[in-house]
Amino acid sequence: MNALAATNRNFKLASRLLGLDSKLEKSLLIPFREIKVECTIPKDDGTLASFVGFRVQHDNARGPMKGGIRYHPEVEPDEVNALAQLMTWKTAVAKIPYGGAKGGIGCDPSELSLSELERLTRVFTQKIHDLIGIHTDVPAPDMGTGPQTMAWILDEYSKFHGHSPAVVTGKPIDLGGSLGRDAATGRGVLFATEALLNEHGKTISGQRFAIQGFGNVGSWAAKLISDKGGKIVAVSDVTGAIKNNNGIDILSLLEHAEENRGIKGFDGADSIDPDSILVEDCDILVPAALGGVINRENANEIKAKFIIEGANHPTDPEADEILKKKGVMILPDIYANSGGVTVSYFEWVQNIQGFMWDEEKVNRELKTYMTRGFKDLKEMCQTHSCDLRMGAFTLGINRVAQATTIRGWGS
């Protein structure tokens, strides 16, 4: 089952629990707008290269649409559509005044020079500039993009619309980025984990973690969890996977990964098969890389008691059912990894106000939002006698449905 089919399935299950009528259900499911553009750029050697870019704007009932732009060879319409829909429910779960969107370009950024990436980003922005905006659709970084990409988008957009720092989030600090944004998704994973463990009378200290992915989300989550006394026993990234039952020294691993562009060769742990990271003996598993990695092939072998979804859609529906029967508690992506979009909201607010918050305020507000979000999620679980995933979906969908109905759109 691909990401879009799985997301639609979860939507329909939640819709049934909420008792939505068919007209409203259809209104919520169909994207507001789907954009597909061709982007041709001159390469450094003088040849021309063409790429296809996408932007799916899913829903704006609760506010401007919000979502990342990813650069990856496998970017395709169904995946972008699914991720845009998930952003709609995620922003609603977080209770921030946004809808959902997602975008991407089918390219391998590792095969393009910095100047080629800049040209590609600027051409893509030229094609979509009149369809995004501060109060319309606010992009952010995602896989294969980062603050520099956002700086190029801001600069190109500003040529058409004047200086508009709030048109993108995840920017460099010198262009209006927010303090604390870089760590926000990983910090949100920490706060989400603390909220779940507290519900079960536990703390992070002494818990054994396996983390799949050591990019922005996984590395920050690992550092912050380690700082709280959590023991990181296994980590993987695109270069390999490592394990140390006594706990990995995360600060040393961060230094190694920065110097060697990955964790491969780290001498403070043993190398293991990257595919085994998800089934390592641990208390808490944090998938923080690609989607669809937990499936029926490996779900029965998972030993973790808790799964915190740092990635988008890491667990497919078949695995969900298997893990539920095993008693594994899954904290779903649309809550667990919402720290990034929440601090993006803080950045947007700061840009509109023209006033910068200090990092302590950013982190304090993020904890407030994540703690409240878990409380709201649990209340929906109790109301509908459902698991955490359906609790999150019913929470998000219900909030969007209410806004849609009040506007008079769903009738």
UniProtKB/Swiss-Prot annotation:
Highest taxon listed in the record's lineage: Eukaryota
Transmembrane ranges, per UniProt, are: none
| Record keywords, A-Z | NAD, Oxidoreductase
**Which InterPro entries does UniProt cross-reference here?**
Aminoacid_DH-like_N_sf, Glu/Leu/Phe/Val/Trp_DH, Glu/Leu/Phe/Val/Trp_DH_C, Glu/Leu/Phe/Val/Trp_DH_dimer, Glu/Leu/Phe/Val_DH_AS, Glu_DH, NAD(P)-bd_dom_sf, NAD_bind_Glu_DH
Gene Ontology molecular function terms on file: glutamate dehydrogenase (NAD+) activity; glutamate dehydrogenase (NADP+) activity
Enzyme's top EC category:
oxidoreductase
Q: What processes in GO biological process is this protein linked to?
A: amino acid metabolic process
Which catalytic reaction applies to this protein?
L-glutamate + NAD(+) + H2O = 2-oxoglutarate + NH4(+) + NADH + H(+); L-glutamate + NADP(+) + H2O = 2-oxoglutarate + NH4(+) + NADPH + H(+)
Residues at the active site: K102
Mind telling me what this protein is named?
Answer: Probable glutamate dehydrogenase 3
Q: Which PROSITE patterns match?
A: GLFV_DEHYDROGENASE
Q: Does the keyword GTP-binding apply?
A: no
Q: Which family does the record claim for this protein? A: Belongs to the Glu/Leu/Phe/Val dehydrogenases family.
Task: Output the Gene Ontology cellular-component terms.
Answer: cytosol; mitochondrion
EC code: 1.4.1.3
